[in-house]
Design a protein with these regions (language model features):
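C-terminal all-alpha effector/ligand-binding and dimerization domain
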Residues: 7-153
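Short linear motifs at protein or domain termini
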Residues: 1-6
Length: 153
């Protein structure tokens, strides 16, 4: 998020819930998991919501990594830094959307009618066949700065 957004944030709220597996989560996480973890990150500046991220992780991954979902500081560190340091590879699909579905309907994303949507799958070295996490990043167009670095593999 921080590399694609021109603002700095003074607050990041993290919420999670446990959801039953759906066909969508089975597809994006590439495994059967009776329960998946859905995590929301709300990036704020001056109280206004400037960006939003939604993450799915399988319960198997959470348990294997011994992640404490109730420790918000450590979870944020994992989601924002450690997962990328431990990643084997990943892919990103860039889309444009006019719809942002926030869990809390009272929240409104700045510029929500025009957002870049980055769909990111991160794979881990320990289990390279299964995604570590699947992210959806919503970045309002007016705050976006998306650059791609291409290297020869």
């Amino acid at each position: 998020m921080h590399k694609c957004h021109i603002s700095t944030f003074d607050q990041v709220d993290l919420h999670y819930r446990l959801d039953p597996q759906t066909e969508h989560t089975k597809q994006v996480l590439r495994r059967d998991s009776a329960t998946v973890v859905a995590l929301e990150r709300l990036y704020r500046k001056g109280g206004e919501l400037h960006a939003y991220a939604f993450t799915f992780m399988s319960m198997q991954t959470v348990e294997r990594l011994s992640l404490d979902l109730d420790n918000k500081e450590r979870m944020l560190d994992f989601l924002e830094d450690k997962a990328y340091a431990d990643a084997n590879h990943g892919n990103i699909e860039i889309k444009y959307t006019h719809t942002v579905n926030l869990a809390d309907r009272k929240d409104k994303l700045m510029g929500q009618n025009e957002c870049f949507l980055l769909l990111e799958t991160i794979f881990d070295k320990a289990e390279p066949d299964y995604p570590l996490m699947y992210n959806k990043f919503y970045i309002p167009q007016q705050f976006s700065n998306i650059k791609l670095n291409i290297t020869k593999g």
